[in-house]
């Protein structure tokens, strides 16, 4: 597991995990710390590499949370919020989030703010512009179209990671359309206003530099903001 530089903002530890690391590394491929439901989920994957990656990323998350809570990984049990975001039912403010893409996982942990992370591996997309028009705000689409064609797909994927991170920090699931707010196609730190049915929420998002070909972002909710 690779500890990444802390982002500008509240204390957030970020970890990059190679899910294809040797089986001896930190017990990432052991089933011992997984719950019965996690083991059952791992057994339902059709492809062996998907099951292996699932086990590895859940073990990595539990190992990191165990270090934060001084608990054994086996004793950590997740509960889901209203829209499916996992939490630890410990009665203490420990926030975490995880994202994965093609053999890698990104994990964020904070004691001060609800957070969200997202990682994407660049890949060819036949009709990505149609998807971008549905997912980007009008301002983001306009900014995207000012870039040279060869840079547009990567910029769209970068924007997508920023939007995903914001929505995961908010814990809103799919109840908010990504095109209804601006997260920006640039990598810089940005404040983001997100309107839900009953309220308006303020988050911050910044893109993350990774030591491999991937795009990633971390977002955190501002005080007194969130569902």
Regions found by a protein language model. Name each.
Residues 1-227:
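Core catalytic alpha/beta fold that binds nucleotide/phospho-ligands
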């Amino acid at each position: 597991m690779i500890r990444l530089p802390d982002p500008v903002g509240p204390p957030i530890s970020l970890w990059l995990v190679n899910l294809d690391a040797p089986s001896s590394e930190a017990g990432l491929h052991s089933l011992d710390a997984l719950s019965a439901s996690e083991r059952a989920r791992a057994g339902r994957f059709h492809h062996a590499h998907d099951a292996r990656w699932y086990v590895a990323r859940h073990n990595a998350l539990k190992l990191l949370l165990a270090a934060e809570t001084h608990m054994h990984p086996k004793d950590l049990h997740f509960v889901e919020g209203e829209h499916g975001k996992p939490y630890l039912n410990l009665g203490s403010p420990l926030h975490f989030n995880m994202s994965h893409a093609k053999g890698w996982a990104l994990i964020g942990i904070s004691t001060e703010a609800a957070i969200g992370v997202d990682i994407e591996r660049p890949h060819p997309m036949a009709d990505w512009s149609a998807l971008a028009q549905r997912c980007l705000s009008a301002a983001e689409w306009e900014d995207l179209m000012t870039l040279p064609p060869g840079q547009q797909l990567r910029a769209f994927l970068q924007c997508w990671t920023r939007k995903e991170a914001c929505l995961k920090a908010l814990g809103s699931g799919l109840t908010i359309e990504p095109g209804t707010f601006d997260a920006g196609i640039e990598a810089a730190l940005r404040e983001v206003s997100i309107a839900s049915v009953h309220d308006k929420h303020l988050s911050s998002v910044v893109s993350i530099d990774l030591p491999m070909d991937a795009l990633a972002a971390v977002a955190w909710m501002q005080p007194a903001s969130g569902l």
